[in-house]
Structures are given as structure tokens and as C-alpha cells.
Swiss-Prot record:
Family classification: Belongs to the IIV-6 467R family.
Keywords, comma-separated and alphabetical: Coiled coil
The name this protein goes by in its record: Uncharacterized protein 467R
UniProt source species: Invertebrate iridescent virus 6
Claim: Coiled coil is one of the keywords in the record: yes
Superkingdom classification of source: Viruses
Any coiled-coil regions, as ranges: 437-465
Length: 503
């Protein structure tokens, strides 16, 4: 044991003594002695432990390498720079190890990259991390997002970012994706879509952006996937895709308005958040909130909606239907996590992400003049956050805007006259079909054929009810829009109902 600290002995003998008799305390003592003594002998001893002594745990060797790097930073006249070289040896031996936590590995790789920026082995280490089958895709995505946000601080090149994103994009799985730590296939797809968003929004000129668009299009067109997933992918293409893919996304979103042979209206179709009127008014409302808050506060004084505050609000305003309490609480927390840690979309002229918008909304609510208004807005915030989970990024924005319907002049989400008439028309026709004695035959006419001659039962019903529907709609809207516009919107509604494209 005494041989460990007998620095007159040859290096080889001291290393053998450390491996045979040393422990964690021994290593820490050597590190302390290095700091105090500035001894090149101790420095060389620690370096050799990193380079040659695989019997010593990766954790201890990593600690030694980082200590050498810190020591060399403080040296006024370093005799030899070996700390980063020592770290390279440790990283090579630990990149397959399960002993070192994921976050510690990443930190070590980034430190190594900052000291040896031309070392290509760092790419190997990152690849192993991002393809580790025991780690959730969400965790891998958060890792890459961290690399994007910390590029300058850690000397991360755009090439490295592109490489990491391309690794995630190339690991696209079908429905056989293994469930890891309760991460379902739908969870995986949601994060994969956000990975595509990250590629297209932060670094739009990267080669992997082409892969991202193709993967999003593949998801959009997959009719075996849920409407929410397909709509989310379409939303990303509408925001970031090429002109051609944007057109494809619009067509797919239109088709998602017809689900299970039922026409979805503005009131029951999540994907209507992409209509121009709704999108414009939602952005207008959020812009009003941002500008009002900016008049009252500096950016650093904005109120932060933390997870603890959200939990307290959920408990304060539970859903009315008790069997749904747990699922609705889970929905609100999932929505919060996407807003805080995952989504990259930017909105308004201020280029705010959903996290910024949520905190501005929370600041506005907390500075409401009336207590009754604050209570109602808090309730609406929780209700909307329960509902926004599993919608696309635009859906989140619309839900935030909808909190303020009736509270702001020109606030909330405005439904266009054409969309209102479509909803009323749909409701009246659907009611007539439901009460008809030939209900099943009429529905078959609508669902199973495109031939007008095979829609006789539906056409017969329509001829009977149409005059009354038109008259009631004209009476309801005569004070708001012209008669010619009413006629146009009714024809459009009839065309949409029959499944035709109206031009």
C-alpha cells in the first residue's frame, strides 16, 4: 500500500500497486495531491490510470480525466496537455458501458469535443447513444435538442447537429417498435414528428431536411395511423415543407375532416385549426396577449407556469365527470411536457415558441383586474390544456387563444361565416337523415357510391328539406352577410356534404 505514494519508485510499480491495493479513496487522494503539489509525476500517474488500467471502474477513470482537464486549465505554464487525451481513452472504453449514466456520457463527449474538435470518434460515441435500444426515443430527442440549443457553448458544429438528427431520422420504426419504459408506438411517432420539425425549423438547409419531409409525408399518408398523428405530421409539412408537400398536406388535412363516413364540422374537427380564419384570429389573439404583457413587464419578470403550479390548478379545478379525472390530468401533464421540452414551432411576429406563449398567457391571467375573471381564465386554461394533448402544434396555439374568447375585444378564435353555415347545414341535414325511416339506405347512398344515380334516396330527402334549411339560414345570417354570399356558402356546404370539391 505504501508503494502507491512512494514517488521514487518507477511508474510501472506504482501503477501495479494502485490496481492491486487502491480504491476510490486512493484515487481521490492522488487527485488532491496533484492540485496541491503541481507534480508532473502524479499527473503522469493519473494519465496512465486512464489510458491503461481498464480494471479501474469507468466512473473513477472519468473522474480522473476530468480532474486532469480542470488542473491543466489552471496551469500557468503547462508542461504537457494530456487531460483531453486521457478523456478520449476513457470515452472509448465507456461508450458501450451501462455503468455510466446517459447524461454523464453526453457531458463527457461534449467536453472531449470542446478540447479535441477534430476528433471523429466523438461521432461514434454519439451514434451509440442515439441508437441505444434501452433508451426511450423521447430521451434521445431531448439529447439532440440540447445539442442544437447549446451549439456555441460546446463548440458543436452544424455538421455534428446534422449528423445527430440524421441518426434519429434513419431509425424510423414501424408498428413493431418495442415498448421501452412505457413509451408506446404512438408516443414514439409523436416524438419522431417533432424530430422532423427540429430538422426543418432549426436547420432548414441541412440535407437531412429532405429525409424529414419524406418521413412526414409517409406518416401523413399511412391510413393505419390515428387521425391525430397524421394531422400532426401534416401540420409540420404545412409549416416547414416544400410547396409541393404543403399541397399534399392540405389535401390530407381535408380528407381527415371526413372520419368514419361522418363529416366533421368546425365544432368537432380538431384539424379545422388549419383553416385560414381560425389560424389568423388565433395568432391575432396571442399577439394581443404578448403586447399587453410586454407593456407591464420586462422579459425577465414574466410569470412562469411551473409543473407544480399546473398540478395545483388541476386539483383546484377538477373535471366534472369523475371517471375521466385521471386521464384528463394525464392529458394536461402530457401537453405541458410537449410545450416545455419538445415542441420547436415558432408563432407570431415575435417568433415565440409554445413555452413562451404559455408563460405570457399565465402572466396575463395572473394580472387580470377582476378576481372573477382570473378564476374563470384559470379554469379555461386547465380545460384547454386537457384538450390540447394529441393535437398538432397549431392546435395548441388555437387552444391558448380560445381561453380569451369573450374576455378580449377581437380575442379568441373566430369562426368564418362559411364555416358556421357549413356547421348549421350539416346539423340540419344530419338531423333529417337520423329521423328518416330510410336512414340506413340514405347513409349507404352517401358512403358507398360516387355515382349520382345511386343516390336517389338521399336526393329525394334533400329535395324535401332543402327549401326550409335555406330559408332558416338566410333568416339567421341576413344581418351579417349578403344574400349572394349566403347562397354561395350554402352551395359550398352542399358540395362538401356530398363529398365533392367545391371551386
Amino acid at each position: 500500500m505504501d508503494d502507491i505514494f512512494n514517488f521514487e519508485l518507477p511508474l510501472h510499480d506504482r501503477i501495479k500497486a494502485i490496481v492491486k491495493f487502491g480504491d476510490e479513496t486512493t484515487i481521490k487522494r492522488l487527485i488532491s495531491l496533484l492540485t496541491i503539489s503541481n507534480s508532473s509525476i502524479i499527473k503522469n500517474t493519473l494519465y496512465h490510470l486512464c489510458k491503461f488500467c481498464s480494471d479501474i471502474s469507468c466512473v473513477l477513470r472519468l473522474e480522473i480525466a476530468l480532474a486532469l482537464i480542470d488542473y491543466e486549465k489552471e496551469e500557468t505554464e503547462p508542461s504537457e496537455i494530456i487531460g483531453f487525451e486521457a478523456l478520449d481513452y476513457v470515452c472509448f472504453s465507456m461508450h458501450k458501458s451501462k455503468e455510466i449514466p446517459f447524461s454523464c456520457k453526453l457531458n463527457a463527449y461534449l467536453i472531449l469535443n470542446s478540447g479535441l474538435p477534430n476528433l471523429k470518434r466523438v461521432y461514434l460515441y454519439l451514434y451509440d447513444m442515439l441508437t441505444d435500444s434501452s433508451t426511450t426515443f423521447q430521451f434521445k430527442y431531448k439529447t439532440v435538442k440540447f445539442l442544437v440549443s447549446e451549439r456555441e457553448e460546446n463548440n458543436i458544429t452544424s455538421l455534428m447537429v446534422e449528423y445527430c438528427i440524421s441518426v434519429l431520422l434513419s431509425n424510423f420504426h414501424d408498428s413493431s417498435y418495442p415498448k421501452i419504459n412505457n413509451e408506446t408506438y404512438e408516443d414514439y411517432l409523436q416524438i419522431f414528428i417533432l424530430t422532423c420539425q427540429l430538422s426543418l425549423s432549426y436547420v432548414p438547409k441541412l440535407k437531412c431536411s429532405c429525409i424529414a419531409e419524406n418521413k412526414l409525408l409517409e406518416i401523413c399518408k399511412n391510413q393505419n395511423l390515428s387521425v391525430n398523428i397524421r394531422a400532426d405530421a401534416s401540420d409540420m409539412l404545412l409549416s416547414y415543407g416544400s410547396s409541393e408537400n404543403k399541397e399534399e398536406a392540405k389535401i390530407i388535412l381535408d380528407s381527415l375532416s371526413f372520419d368514419n363516413h361522418t363529416i366533421k364540422t368546425i365544432y368537432n374537427n380538431k384539424e379545422n385549426v388549419h383553416t385560414s380564419t381560425i389560424n389568423k384570429t388565433a395568432i391575432n389573439t396571442i399577439t394581443i396577449i404578448i403586447e399587453d404583457v410586454n407593456k407591464m413587464f420586462q422579459r425577465e419578470d414574466i410569470w412562469i407556469l411551473t409543473e407544480n403550479i399546473l398540478q395545483n390548478l388541476i386539483e383546484k379545478y377538477p373535471p366534472n365527470f369523475k371517471p375521466q379525472i385521471k386521464s384528463q390530468i394525464d392529458n394536461a401533464i402530457k401537453a405541458y411536457n410537449r410545450i416545455m421540452y419538445l415542441d420547436n414551432a415558432l408563432y407570431t411576429a415575435y417568433n415565440f415558441n409554445l413555452k413562451n406563449i404559455m408563460n405570457y398567457v399565465w402572466t396575463f391571467i395572473n394580472n387580470s383586474n377582476k378576481v372573477s375573471n382570473k378564476v374563470e381564465l384559470e379554469k379555461r386554461l386547465i380545460e384547454e390544456m386537457r384538450e390540447m394533448n394529441n393535437t398538432c402544434s397549431s392546435g395548441y396555439l388555437t387552444r391558448f387563444a380560445n381561453i380569451f374568447s369573450g374576455f378580449l375585444e377581437n380575442g379568441g378564435v373566430f369562426i368564418g361565416w362559411d364555416e358556421q353555415i357549413l356547421s348549421i347545414f350539416y346539423g340540419k341535414v344530419n338531423s333529417a337523415i337520423t329521423s328518416s325511416l330510410n336512414k340506413d339506405l340514405i347513409l349507404e347512398n352517401l358512403i358507398e357510391t360516387e355515382n349520382e344515380n345511386d343516390k336517389q334516396e338521399f336526393q329525394k330527402l334533400l329535395r324535401t328539406i332543402l327549401p326550409n334549411i335555406i330559408e332558416s339560414i338566410k333568416i339567421e345570417f341576413k344581418d351579417h352577410i349578403s344574400e349572394s354570399d349566403i347562397d354561395l356558402y350554402i352551395r359550398r356546404a352542399l358540395s362538401v356534404f356530398e363529398g365533392h370539391e367545391f371551386i
